[in-house]
């Protein structure tokens, strides 16, 4: 029997509805949640992501601001703008869309964001606090993946989980959240010799590499949960993930689609992080 789909769109809609109600209550008290988005350059994919984030804010009662800058913006000017946003009481979350132009040090920029407004969860203070299990914010994509596991009431305690991909944005924080959930976690990276040797034993597989069809049916244990974080395009320009969806769906117990899986949840958890920042600021 084909795997059950974990519908990211449906789950995102439910969580956003609850977030909108919380945002409305805050707004009544004079504390409308506010997200500032900063875009440098003309990267087409970044423009789409930014547009979706701003629209999600508007649709759910959040205040949003969008700063667009040309690709030749200086690092000093960008840092000065972040400093202004750090001091703006109307702004509770600051998101700098990555990637940045090569002449700008993205690490320096992310570290300039006040930790209490770091709704992406990338600041070293939040990344470090994630290790102790008490971050102000969890990175949005791993947070969304955990919510998807929660939605199917998956018993993580004692489960074997394999995260394919070791980025600071997804792979590493994903592994930490799974570990905190009680799973036994393995991280595969670009140097891993035989990824399938690890994934075939896994109860949960999270694919987050950015390589089409990396995870195939013969690499998945029957009944496993497969979460596809990848965002690629096939030969026809159609969106696809890191998982061979058609093949793996015949083996797995649960699977997330691309599109309509992790993507909507990432933006949703950005709203939740911004909302929680606003609630903390409101007291």
Curated annotation (Swiss-Prot):
The keyword Hydrolase applies. One of its GO terms (molecular function) is methylenetetrahydrofolate dehydrogenase (NADP+) activity. The keyword NADP applies. The gene is folD. One of its GO terms (cellular component) is cytosol. One of its GO terms (biological process) is purine nucleotide biosynthetic process. Catalyzes the oxidation of 5,10-methylenetetrahydrofolate to 5,10-methenyltetrahydrofolate and then the hydrolysis of 5,10-methenyltetrahydrofolate to 10-formyltetrahydrofolate. InterPro entries: Aminoacid_DH-like_N_sf, NAD(P)-bd_dom_sf, THF_DH/CycHdrlase, THF_DH/CycHdrlase_cat_dom, THF_DH/CycHdrlase_CS, THF_DH/CycHdrlase_NAD-bd_dom. The lineage of its organism: Bacteria, Pseudomonadati, Pseudomonadota, Betaproteobacteria, Burkholderiales. This is Bifunctional protein FolD. Its EC number is 1.5.1.5, 3.5.4.9. It catalyses: (6R)-5,10-methylene-5,6,7,8-tetrahydrofolate + NADP(+) = (6R)-5,10-methenyltetrahydrofolate + NADPH; (6R)-5,10-methenyltetrahydrofolate + H2O = (6R)-10-formyltetrahydrofolate + H(+). Keywords: Amino-acid biosynthesis, Histidine biosynthesis, Hydrolase, Methionine biosynthesis, Multifunctional enzyme, NADP, One-carbon metabolism, Oxidoreductase, Purine biosynthesis. Homodimer. It comes from Cupriavidus taiwanensis (strain DSM 17343 / BCRC 17206 / CCUG 44338 / CIP 107171 / LMG 19424 / R1). Pathway: One-carbon metabolism; tetrahydrofolate interconversion. CDD domains: NAD_bind_m-THF_DH_Cyclohyd. NCBIfam families: PRK10792.1, PRK14186.1, PRK14189.1. NADP(+) binds at residues 165-167, 190. Belongs to the tetrahydrofolate dehydrogenase/cyclohydrolase family. Gene3D superfamilies: Leucine Dehydrogenase, chain A, domain 1, NAD(P)-binding Rossmann-like Domain.
């Amino acid at each position: 029997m084909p795997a059950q789909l974990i519908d990211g769109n449906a789950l995102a809609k439910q969580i956003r509805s609850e977030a909108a109600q919380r945002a409305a209550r805050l707004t009544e008290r004079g504390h409308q949640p506010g997200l500032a988005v900063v875009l440098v350059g003309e990267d087409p994919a970044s423009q789409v992501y930014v547009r979706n984030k701003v629209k999600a804010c508007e649709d759910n009662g959040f205040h949003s601001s969008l700063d667009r800058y040309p690709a030749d913006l200086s690092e000093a000017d960008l840092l000065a703008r972040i400093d202004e946003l750090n001091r703006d009481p109307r702004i509770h979350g600051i998101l700098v869309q990555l990637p940045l132009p090569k002449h700008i040090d993205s690490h320096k920029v992310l570290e300039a964001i006040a930790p209490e407004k770091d709704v992406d969860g990338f600041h070293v203070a939040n990344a470090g606090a994630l290790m102790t299990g008490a971050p102000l914010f969890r990175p949005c994509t791993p947070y969304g993946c955990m919510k998807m596991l929660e939605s199917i009431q998956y018993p993580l305690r004692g489960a074997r989980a394999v995260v394919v991909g070791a980025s600071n944005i997804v792979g590493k924080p994903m592994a930490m959240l799974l570990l905190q959930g009680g799973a036994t976690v393995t991280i595969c990276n670009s140097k891993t010799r035989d990824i399938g040797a690890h994934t075939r034993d896994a109860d949960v597989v999270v694919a987050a590499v950015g390589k089409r069809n990396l995870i195939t049916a013969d690499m998945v244990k029957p009944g496993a949960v497969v979460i596809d974080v990848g965002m690629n395009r096939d030969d026809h320009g159609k969106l696809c993930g890191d998982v061979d969806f058609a093949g793996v769906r015949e083996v797995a117990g649960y699977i997330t689609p691309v599109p309509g899986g992790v993507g909507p949840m990432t933006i949703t958890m950005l709203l939740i992080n911004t909302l929680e920042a606003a609630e903390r600021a409101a007291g």
